Design a protein with these regions (language model features):
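C-terminal catalytic histidine-bearing segment of alpha/beta-hydrolase fold enzymes
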Residues: 122, 129-166
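Active-site nucleophile loop of the alpha/beta-hydrolase fold
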Residues: 48-58
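Short glycine-enriched nucleophile-adjacent loop
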Residues: 31-42, 47
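Alpha/beta-hydrolase fold nucleophile elbow
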Residues: 16-27
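The feature captures the conserved acid-bearing segment of alpha/beta-hydrolase catalytic domains
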Residues: 59-120
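Alpha/beta-hydrolase active-site loop
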Residues: 1-17
């Protein structure tokens, strides 16, 4: 919650400084924050969400890099209860707000991601498409962490730059 509040405050500061086109970009967990900011702040024109997914609970439950978190939850909470508790953090809860006409959304996902499984990302994409979101989806044949390495980081940077500058 605090990250979204802080992000919205930064948008107000940028607007007071004269900026009229506001974009947000986030990678991995930061893409959830950027998506939540875009969903809740109508001043955002573009959102570039890299390595994102819609269901944070499922990402923690199924992602290989999240095993230690999952282990701490085992026997204490079921996935359905975690989903309910974390619903305010799930981008899938805000598909309608992300589908507003004045917002363009880019999603870049890694087809071999073991942190945010492609099924988690693709379900968000399907829901956004179903809601009529202005959506640009890019799929790279890499994993979550290899996105930060050449040539993927170069390709990703160029795609995000093109999207945000148009």
């Amino acid at each position: 919650r605090q990250a979204v509040v802080d992000g919205r405050q930064l948008i107000k500061i940028a607007q007071r400084a004269g900026y009229r086109k506001i974009s947000v970009l986030g990678i991995s967990l930061g893409s959830w924050v950027a998506g939540l900011i875009a969903a809740h702040d109508p001043a955002v024109d573009k959102a570039s969400l890299l390595l994102t997914g819609g269901d944070l609970a499922e990402m923690v439950w199924t992602g290989g890099a999240m095993r230690h978190i999952r282990a701490s939850l085992d026997g204490k909470i079921e996935l359905s209860d975690l989903r309910r508790a974390w619903a305010p953090l799930n981008l899938e809860s805000y598909v309608g707000k992300l589908a507003r006409p004045a917002l363009d959304v880019q999603i870049l996902l890694a087809t071999r991601d073991r942190v945010v499984l492609p099924t988690v990302s693709e379900r968000l994409v399907q829901r956004l498409e179903g809601a009529g979101t202005s959506l640009n989806v890019e799929r790279l044949n890499c994993g979550h962490y290899s996105l930060t390495l050449p040539p993927y980081i170069i390709t990703t940077g160029m795609r995000a730059s093109r999207f945000l500058s148009r």
